[in-house]
UniProtKB/Swiss-Prot annotation:
Its EC number is 2.7.7.6. The keyword rRNA-binding does not apply. One of its GO terms (molecular function) is DNA-directed RNA polymerase activity. One of its GO terms (biological process) is DNA-templated transcription. Belongs to the RNA polymerase subunit epsilon family. It comes from the Bacteria. It is an enzyme of class 2 (transferase). It comes from Listeria monocytogenes serovar 1/2a (strain ATCC BAA-679 / EGD-e). This is DNA-directed RNA polymerase subunit epsilon.
């Protein structure tokens, strides 16, 4: 499954919607996504499982890439 993770780049500042970024992670569950990203230096706001149609749409963006550690 592919998950879209919305995050802020810093742990020390209050989250601001305009600074929210996203990345895509392949994992078995939302819990696994959070475990994979727990040591990263950013604040996870939301993790969303995306549908096949949503994934196809996101892949049209030339900047689309799955996160790799």
């Amino acid at each position: 499954m592919i998950f879209k993770v919305f995050y802020q780049e810093t742990l020390t500042e209050t989250p601001v919607r305009e600074k929210t970024q996203s990345l895509y992670v392949e994992a078995e569950s939302e819990v696994k996504v959070r475990q994979l990203l727990k040591d990263e230096p950013f604040h996870i706001e939301f993790v969303e499982k995306i549908s096949d149609a949503h994934l196809a749409y996101e892949k049209e963006n030339p900047d689309f890439a799955l996160w790799e550690k």
